[in-house]
Swiss-Prot record:
InterPro entries: Aa-tRNA-synt_II, aa-tRNA-synth_II, aa-tRNA-synth_II/BPL/LPL, Lys-tRNA-ligase_II, Lys-tRNA-ligase_II_bac/euk, Lys-tRNA-ligase_II_N, Lys-tRNA-synth_II_C, NA-bd_OB-fold. CDD domains: LysRS_core, LysRS_N. The keyword Transferase does not apply. The lineage of its organism: Eukaryota, Metazoa, Ecdysozoa, Nematoda, Chromadorea. The gene is kars-1. This is Lysine--tRNA ligase. Its main location: cytoplasm.
Amino acid sequence: MSEPEAKLSKNEQKRLAKQAKKEQERLEKDAAKLNVAVADAPKVVREADPSDPQEYFNMRVRMIEARRAAGDNPFPHKFNVTISLTDFITKYTPLEKEQVVEEIVSVAGRIHSKRESGSKLVFYDIHGEGTHIQIMANAKFHTGDVDFVTLHDRIKRGDIVGFTGRATRTKAGELSLIPNEILQLTPCLHMLPHSHFGLKDKELRFRKRYLDLILNPRVKDNFVIRSKIITFLRRYLDNLGFLEVETPIMNQIAGGATAKPFITHHNDLDMNLFLRVAPELYHKMLVVGGIDRVYEVGRLFRNEGIDLTHNPEFTTCEFYMAYADYEDVIQLTEDLLSSMVMSIKGTYKIEYHPNGPNTEPVYEVDFTPPFKRVHMYDGLAEKLGATLPDPSTLHTEEAREVFDKLCRDNNVDCSAPRTTARLLDKLVGEYLESTFISPTFLIGHPQIMSPLAKWHRSIPGLTERFELFAVTREIANAYTELNDPITQRQRFEQQAKDKDAGDDEAQMIDETFCNALEYGLPPTGGWGMGIDRLSMILTDNNNIKEVLLFPAMRPEDGTEKKTDFDAPTTLA
């Protein structure tokens, strides 16, 4: 049996406790040399920043002018960033509380918040690259020509600032940088909206995307996904042996799609030109020339309406594949999109809110291949419960009258000119397209709706064409290309008649393209997909403006909308 432990006297207990306390104070004092705030010095009473946007703007301009007058450049040419904010977080996340590293690093970012604890300690949150870190500026470690208080008086929310110092983790567990050198890189002249409320006005967000990105950093996520879509597309097609090409944006004839073009004028040639509505005809001429697989990612321009799914300029990917038909292109499309969605989202099934975030209903969109197929003509007849004219007679006036009556009887609106093609398109949109949630191929379009598609090999009057829909919207269009130059010219002539009848979207005869076809286009499958609409689906946005960095906006009486935090860009 061991001897009983000697009991310490009360005095001895007090002595040991006092010694332990002193040791703890010594450790905390040592830690404070790099990490712990010094005791607050008497606060310096400073004038509050103006709340009026114009006065605030003037104050910031005066600060810049005063620095320039003193020979100080308020906009330095260079700051050497040694580590990104993302890498800073990755590298120093393992730090324990109150641990400080010896390594000196330099970071930079935009100030989103500023908090002062007396006159000797200032906290900042700096944002950049979609992330943020805390800066803990302590007067004890400050070096530089400008004194601590003056320097930090200059720095406001919105400024871009560089910091050089050591990484640490505070007592509260916040990963931070303790700077010894601070350089104001770019002053922000305007007051930023309060970070708690952010920027909610959608129209203002779209008009001032730069401010939207500053205050709503998650908006960038939409454009990261958009970029991934385009990168995946290019890599996929490159791996299949396609050649990426560039074709003219200004054309003498607006061909390749049924759409109303933008018109511009070339002064030297003294002629009108059209911004391209589609690159299709150029691509097929390249296939005639022997480039069997071509694709292009680029902007198209259509002088039509602006709404939740349409913008006058938009981005598409088009490809043309010799010795393939629309069945080959269907299989390629299924593989391309299903593998893309899996690569970007990590699953085939995604959720989509057609009425906007956090609303009902919620669609489950399933990109698992194979996709559903619906035959346009048979599907429409079934939905209408009607017998439709034989597809081979759709060019007749009798057929047009049947579809005109169907639209009237079913209250389906169709503005003039009420051609058979336009009437059919409205009926299909109302009764078929509106039901397609998961990816669905709509196949077998009539020839009168598809002037560039090849006739169906077994059903007269129809073509070998498909449109791909998801969440009720068209995202791709493809067909076996018409390569018969005689039939192509006849279809162009019919389109010209429709244009004379008032259809602004009908195509004109393109003699250069017709001549190219006469040299021989091999059997070819062609395909086009809208990048913007696919981006909307994969980012769960119901407004196309959310996936366009700078969407088209209607003017506001010739003046730009002002906000309660805006100020003129000139001194009052």
